């Protein structure tokens, strides 16, 4: 509207949604770190558990498994835990998939993965933990790639003295 354009010069801060605004909106798996099993086995378990989920991170994991032609396991039970992750049953075993808080709340030691999670998070990646019963199997990092134009646009805002805040 004309009124919005007239007041635009007063803007001090721009708040942007990350997914689809700054990024492509298509997360991809960037790192797979396993403990006691192969990376492909971890990806098989992870994709199997994530298959019923509609979360964009689940889609990235499933796509990574499909690219490697990994056959998925059958999932018997599937429970989404809001803000935490998923609890599922496969081959008679309880599988946990989610953030560190979910692992902590279920008494699952992250077995030295905290430093790796911190490093990956600092790179702008989202880290998901996977555990079977009470044993951590590994972590998978997922990242949404920034759009080609995002850096230049943010630089332009900063040149104009406008702060940029990203919501995630």
What is the predicted function of each stretch?
Residues 2-168:
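Cytosolic catalytic headpiece
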